[in-house]
Amino acid sequence: MNGQTPARHYYKKLVPSLILILNCIQFLSHPTKADPILLAFVFAVYLAFIWIIPYVASTAVSLSIFIGLWLLTDFFWAVSGQEQGAAYFLIVFLMIYAAFRLPSRLSLIFTACLIGGNILLLSSQGGSLNTIISNISIMLGLYVLFSSMRFRREARREAERNHAELAKMHVQLEHAHKELQKAHAELQEASVLSLRYAVLEERTRIARDIHDSIGHELTSVIVQLQSLPYILKSSKEDSEKVIQNVLSVARECLQEVRSVVHQMGRSESMVGLTALRGLIHQVEERSGLHVSLDTAGLSEESWPPNVSETIYRILQEALTNIIRHADASHAAAVISNDKSHLYVTITDDGQFTGSLTYGFGLTGMKERAEKAGGSLTFSAVQPSGLKIELSLPLMTTNKEQKDEQR
């Protein structure tokens, strides 16, 4: 029932039924040439029509019912002679219902047929020109009035449907946006974990070096110190040699410890470049996109952890966008620096020609760069492709180097 409540649907049938019943009583109460039984029968058919037509889904069946009522009414008009009050009322009633129930074009054609039939009947029964014009004017006016009411009602319903669909789409978009944010957060967390794993791997390597080099040398020191009391009793010269050997090994251990500590202090920054190479290798294996990395202009390889993470995530998002949207076969990343800044340029040979839409990924890249105190720009590459230029400050690195020198 088009989403209507049962009470409203019942009301829409009850009102026209009462109109028919009241008019039928009025026409029967006045003496006319029309057969009362035939008049009551025609009104009863119309009454049944009101309660049946809402359940007819087929347009063809509905049109057939309307045509049948029209022919029945014209027959009633013809056999009633000059008495055409009840018949004319029923014709107008049928026209109004057609304006509401039939499709717009069919209702217009059906109304034209009704008007044409009225003209023929009035002419055949000697109706005057003024009567014909008056009847046609009334019918046209009523048709325009009720058709406009129908159009407004349909427009309102369409607007309500569109509003409901937009609200539903808005909810779906909000859900999708939350899912994207969740996925993006998980991706960020995975990026951080990959960097941490790289740091742990580097520290494991350093621990292994300590065990293999310093551990061996300290074992040698312990053995020589354990034998020293016996050597002192036997030969003074041999004992001096042992002491010199122990001192030499101890100095080497100290130098090795300093070297390891220095490497551990730099491991979190040096891991940035290692992580980038690992990311590029992973992308090439999984997507088939060829990615080159140029570090010829890189003289400063000691990056702060926040710089390493920012570069890693921006390169990761850039390569993801290239794979998804650019239809590129090659991408290139160039990393360089000067005294105060680190520069990363990412280019591809994809389909981009100059019209850029800032989506979730590009906006996130730009915000990430700005959060790190840097900047990110996008520009077109001739003949096609996209260039991403990232600039990040290295002040934190310079400060760390000064602390190390102290």
Swiss-Prot record:
<dbReference type="Pfam" id="PF02518">
    <property type="entry name" value="HATPase_c"/>
</dbReference>
<dbReference type="Pfam" id="PF07730">
    <property type="entry name" value="HisKA_3"/>
</dbReference>
<keyword id="KW-1133">Transmembrane helix</keyword>
<feature type="topological domain" description="Cytoplasmic">
    <location>
        <begin position="147"/>
        <end position="406"/>
    </location>
</feature>
<feature type="modified residue" description="Phosphohistidine; by autocatalysis">
    <location>
        <position position="211"/>
    </location>
</feature>
<keyword id="KW-0808">Transferase</keyword>
<dbReference type="InterPro" id="IPR050482">
    <property type="entry name" value="Sensor_HK_TwoCompSys"/>
</dbReference>
<keyword id="KW-0472">Membrane</keyword>
<keyword id="KW-0547">Nucleotide-binding</keyword>
<feature type="transmembrane region" description="Helical">
    <location>
        <begin position="80"/>
        <end position="100"/>
    </location>
</feature>
<keyword id="KW-0902">Two-component regulatory system</keyword>
<keyword id="KW-1003">Cell membrane</keyword>
<feature type="topological domain" description="Cytoplasmic">
    <location>
        <begin position="1"/>
        <end position="13"/>
    </location>
</feature>
<keyword id="KW-0812">Transmembrane</keyword>
<dbReference type="InterPro" id="IPR011712">
    <property type="entry name" value="Sig_transdc_His_kin_sub3_dim/P"/>
</dbReference>
<dbReference type="GO" id="GO:0000155">
    <property type="term" value="F:phosphorelay sensor kinase activity"/>
</dbReference>
<feature type="domain" description="Histidine kinase">
    <location>
        <begin position="209"/>
        <end position="396"/>
    </location>
</feature>
<dbReference type="GO" id="GO:0004672">
    <property type="term" value="F:protein kinase activity"/>
</dbReference>
<keyword id="KW-0418">Kinase</keyword>
<keyword id="KW-0597">Phosphoprotein</keyword>
<feature type="transmembrane region" description="Helical">
    <location>
        <begin position="102"/>
        <end position="122"/>
    </location>
</feature>
<feature type="transmembrane region" description="Helical">
    <location>
        <begin position="14"/>
        <end position="34"/>
    </location>
</feature>
<keyword id="KW-0067">ATP-binding</keyword>
<feature type="topological domain" description="Cytoplasmic">
    <location>
        <position position="58"/>
    </location>
</feature>
<feature type="transmembrane region" description="Helical">
    <location>
        <begin position="59"/>
        <end position="79"/>
    </location>
</feature>
<feature type="transmembrane region" description="Helical">
    <location>
        <begin position="37"/>
        <end position="57"/>
    </location>
</feature>
<dbReference type="InterPro" id="IPR036890">
    <property type="entry name" value="HATPase_C_sf"/>
</dbReference>
<feature type="topological domain" description="Extracellular">
    <location>
        <begin position="35"/>
        <end position="36"/>
    </location>
</feature>
<protein>
    <recommendedName>
        <fullName>Sensor histidine kinase YxjM</fullName>
        <ecNumber>2.7.13.3</ecNumber>
    </recommendedName>
</protein>
<feature type="topological domain" description="Extracellular">
    <location>
        <begin position="123"/>
        <end position="125"/>
    </location>
</feature>
<feature type="transmembrane region" description="Helical">
    <location>
        <begin position="126"/>
        <end position="146"/>
    </location>
</feature>
<dbReference type="GO" id="GO:0005886">
    <property type="term" value="C:plasma membrane"/>
</dbReference>
<comment type="function">
    <text>Probable member of the two-component regulatory system YxjM/YxjL. May activate YxjL by phosphorylation.</text>
</comment>
<dbReference type="GO" id="GO:0005524">
    <property type="term" value="F:ATP binding"/>
</dbReference>
<feature type="topological domain" description="Cytoplasmic">
    <location>
        <position position="101"/>
    </location>
</feature>
<dbReference type="GO" id="GO:0046983">
    <property type="term" value="F:protein dimerization activity"/>
</dbReference>
